[in-house]
Every structure is written in C-alpha cells, then in structure tokens.
C-alpha cells in the first residue's frame, strides 16, 4: 500500500506544520493568561494601598496628595541602598507600591520615637542654603530654564532675521535707484547723440539737395519730386527703426549683466523704452507738422499762377531777344552773356520747380476732396437704403402681429360663445330632462 493519503491534506493534524501552529497558539494563550493574572494582582495591590491610605486618614493623619513630591523625598536609610533606589525612582524602574509600603513601615517605626523624644529633640531647623541647593537641583526648574533660554533665542533670531530682511530691502532699493539713474542718463545720452546725428544728416542732406538744385538746369517733374520725398521719408523711418532696435539690443545686454534678483524690474525698463520711443515719434511728428505748416504757408498756385506765367513769358521773350542779339556777336561775347545770365536762369528754375510742386499739391488736394465727397455721398445713399429697408421690415412685422392678434381675439370670442351656450343650456334644463337623460343608467343599475 502507498500509505495514508490524508497526510497530503493541509488540515491533517499529524503534519508537523499543523502541530507547530497549535503549539504557538497554546503558548500565546498561556502568556495572555499570565499577563492578565499579573494585571489583576497589580490592581489588587493598588486597591490594598488605597485602603491603607484611607485607614490612615481615618486615624487622624493628614490627607496625602497625589503629586510628584515623592520624587524629592529621600528614601529610608534603613535599607542601605540610597543611590540605587534614587536612580530607580528617577528612571521609573522601581514600583510605587513598594515605595509606599516602605514609607508606611518607616513612618510607623518613627512614630514611637517621635512620641518618646518629642520633648528632648528640638524642632528641625530649615537651612536656607539647603533649601537653595534643593531648588537649584530641581529637574523641573532646569527644564523651565531651558525652555526660557530656547524662547529667548527664538525671539532674538526672529528679530535678527527681520533686521536682515529690512537691510536687504534697503540695499535692493538703493541699487534699483542707482540702476534707474544710470539707465536714464544713458538713455538721455543716446537720445542727444541720436538727435545730433539726425540733425547733422538732415543738414547735410538739405545742403546736398540745395547744391543739386543749383546744379540742375531742368526743373524736376512732379513724379520725380514725389518719389524723392517718399525716398527721404522711407530713409528716415528706416533710420528710426534701426535706432530703436539698437536701443532695445543695448537694453537687453544691460539686463543680462545684472543679477537675477533684478529681473522683476525688466518690465519697468521696457515701459521706459516704449515711452522714450513714443517721445521720439512725437518729436518726429512735430517736426513733420512744422514742415507741413511751412509748406502750407508758401504761396499757392492759384494765387501766383498769373504772376509766374507773366514772368515765364517775359523770361522767354527776353531769352529770345538775347539769342537774336547774340547771333550777331562773336563767340567770346556770347560766352560772357551766358555767364552773366546764369544766376537769373537758376532763380527761374527754382521758381518753376516750386510752381510744379504747388500745382501737384493742389491737384492732390482736389483729388482727395473729390474722393471724400464721393465716399460721403455713397455713405448717405447706403444709409438711406438701410433706413428704407428698416422701415419696410418694421411695417411687415407690425402687420403680421396685427393679423395674429385679430386671429387670437376671434378664436377667444368663439370659445367664449361656446362656453356661454353650455352654461345657458345647463341653466335652462329642468329636473324631468335630467331624469330622462339619466334613465338609461338607472335601468342598467337595476339589471
């Protein structure tokens, strides 16, 4: 036979594993019973101690308060274990019931000696030095002293930290003011340098333009003058944008060199740069408006056309007469006349170019005025059409609402008429008619 197959079951009691588990459970139960018995004995001892204290209080002894005074009382010297007992009391290794029983026994023995030698022995004298030594050796006093020292250190540390924070804020404000002053000075310096450079460039360009006009013999055409003014304006805009980019790049470089705690002031620096840029733009705008006002104060073509046409015809006639006179002169005299007439010709060219510019400006103003009038007429016509459509839509909506209201009133009146007929019929019905109508129901109930 192969043996008992029940040994292969996990629940079989013959297995060593199950036997060990049963032994461990029995051992745990035995230890539990021992702990319960020990706790019961301790409670019984405490009850007996309380009973003894009650009997002592009944016999006339003062009531003992449950305080920590027993820690500072010296144990009886009869045992001969003063140091060990004191260490056990302080560390909690000795039981309180044994201490109380020993104290009771020692007090019983001392009671007889007190009665015998009451008259002979003088009362105990409290030495102030001993009292001070006991107070200084008090562990609770030491604990209080340490707590007070820790509290004072904490207060001093908080005061020192707040003072350090105030000093740091003061230093940060001082650095911020210094950086703002440096930034303002550098911005003013860059602005003045840029303004002086722009003024030099404008002066050089105006001088070059005047020299070019003196050198040229033929007047500029309107398209060419407009193109030249557009090129100058584009050049000025490109120069301003380049200066702004240079300022921004310089501001970014200065911000990168500062410490990390100054990063929150970058927005303020950006606002200052934007305000300076807007100020430069306003300066350019004022300069352009002054230039336009100066151009507007110049004589218009309508007022001076007759004068300039007369001057032009006189110049032509004078030139024709001079040319006819010069045909009979030798080459040397004709050259001298050309040199003499050079200045009037340049002045005529300047007058012609100014006349052409004024004519172009007048034509542009006329075209703009016509376009503005045309747009205004279109807007007025569109507004009239929209107003007509709105009025037509309002009329349609009001007509539709009126029809719906009439239909509702008609339906409501018909419904009221029907309900009124029903009420009138009910009022006119008699008892015989009601019984006649309900006779069929009564017959069915009888069946």
Curated annotation (Swiss-Prot):
Pfam families: Cir_N, CWC25
UniProt signal peptide: none
Localization per record: Nucleus
Main location: nucleus
Region ranges (Disordered): 153-384, 400-447
Parts forming coiled coils: 15-59, 363-403
GO biological process: mRNA splicing, via spliceosome
Alphabetical UniProt keywords: Coiled coil, mRNA processing, mRNA splicing, Nucleus, Spliceosome
GO cellular component: U2-type spliceosomal complex
Stretches with biased composition (Basic and acidic residues): 153-204, 223-288, 306-377, 400-417, 432-447
Basic residues: compositionally biased ranges: 205-217
Functional note: Involved in pre-mRNA splicing.
Quaternary context: Associated with the spliceosome.
PANTHER family in alphabetical order: CELL CYCLE CONTROL PROTEIN CWF25, PRE-MRNA-SPLICING FACTOR CWC25 HOMOLOG
Family: Belongs to the CWC25 family.
Name used for this protein in its record: Pre-mRNA-splicing factor cwc25
